[in-house]
């Protein structure tokens, strides 16, 4: 594959959508084809799965939830991500397998290694070239969410201890793979964050162009 795969990760309320939009604008100005997508919900099937995992009323068993995310990932990678990469596009994706490890692994207290293995199997081993982790204290993130919304999905509505486990899991993943992750303080001004991300993306894309 000749494209570049960039994912944005972090807890709820950290500004992933904002940074994705800013990065897309910059990349398109540089002449790149950019595909912006998300998990769950980056395909027609994924939209249906998203409704179940985020908005269905009532309990979903943690293992069933993990499998639903994996099903979405398998279809999404096969039908959206890989075709875009194969034609040389830059794929900007809101959440990927690291979210499964953090939310279903740490948040739902499932085995993180099993969740990662399941995700890699679903994605046929596809890892991002760059993962941007927007890190923010969960209390500050909650203030942002409360200011922005009146309704919350099933994960956003979880308690503070759930979100703290998720945050620490993300930081652990970044520490384990520093070559793949860029960790940015999501409390910084958005233009400062965008500049950090652009600098790393520029190096990555330039290296690919010269390879």
Curated annotation (Swiss-Prot):
GO terms for cellular component: cytosol. Its EC number is 2.7.4.9. GO terms for biological process: dTDP biosynthetic process; dTTP biosynthetic process; dUDP biosynthetic process. InterPro entries: P-loop_NTPase, Thymidylate_kin-like_dom, Thymidylate_kinase. SUPFAM superfamilies: P-loop containing nucleoside triphosphate hydrolases (SSF52540). It comes from the Bacteria. ATP binds at residues 10-17. Keywords: ATP-binding, Kinase, Nucleotide biosynthesis, Nucleotide-binding, Transferase. CDD domains: TMPK. The keyword Cell wall biogenesis/degradation does not apply. It catalyses: dTMP + ATP = dTDP + ADP. One of its GO terms (molecular function) is dTMP kinase activity. Pfam families: Thymidylate_kin (PF02223). The keyword Nucleotide-binding applies. Phosphorylation of dTMP to form dTDP in both de novo and salvage pathways of dTTP synthesis. Belongs to the thymidylate kinase family. This is Thymidylate kinase. It comes from Clavibacter sepedonicus.
